[in-house]
Amino acid sequence: MRAFDPDLLPVVVLTLRVTVSALVIAAVVGIPAGVWLGLARFPGKRVLTALVYTGMALPPVVVGLLTYMLLSRSGPLAFLEWLFTPNAMILAQTVMALPLVAGLVMGAVASVPHDLVLQVRSLGATPWQVRWTILREVRVAVLFALLVAFGRIVSEVGAAYMVGGNIQGYTRVLSTAVMMETGKGDFGVALALGGWLMVLALTVNLAAMRLQGRLA
């Protein structure tokens, strides 16, 4: 593979497909979970919070190993037949992104002055209306959480390689392509592919900055 090889386009497209799919799933689950954890008071909250924070720091290779074990022939999810497919990569990246989104949103919600929560409740707001109001209050922090999650999973190698297999034309993404070219000693191509990753990250960050200006 070369930096401007025609075969590069499917790799870029798959990178975006896997990353965006995982990020959307993590957002749909993680944002409501983070808001709930930030506002709720219940026994065992500290334990659950500790688990979320632990998940935020979980090494990608461990995520890859756990996902591999779940999807392998002897695993409980073997019937899905996802191992060495893009779906397996999406699952692994979702596992990495979800705690990040939930944890950062939870921290942002918990930092909202309690007086504001009481004020909203005193106006007769339902629990869902309270959560929605607080979510709007921390919308910039939510955007930041999604950016952090995107940055982590778009460049992830270990889990993607373990459960995807780096199969040309099927599960090869930019990060695993960089690793492959580096292993072959073709550092020029590896750097060029890394440049494509930087372009993706820069594009997303510029779009997020523009959106942040509208949200502020």
What is each model feature region?
Residues 24, 104-105, 109, 113, ...:
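Transmembrane alpha-helices
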Residues 8-37:
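Transmembrane alpha-helix signature in integral membrane proteins
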Residues 40-48, 85, 127-128, 140-141:
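Membrane-helix interface segments
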Residues 13-21, 55, 128, 132-140, ...:
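Alpha-helical transmembrane segments of multi-pass membrane proteins
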Residues 6, 63-94, 164-167:
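Membrane-interfacial helix termini and adjacent extracytoplasmic/periplasmic loops
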Residues 1-7, 161-202, 206-207:
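Interhelical loop and adjacent transmembrane-helix boundary motif
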Residues 33-67, 117:
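Cytoplasmic-entry segments and transmembrane alpha-helices of multi-pass inner-membrane transporters
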Residues 44, 103-133, 191-216:
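C-terminal transmembrane helix and the adjacent membrane-cytosol boundary/short C-terminal tail
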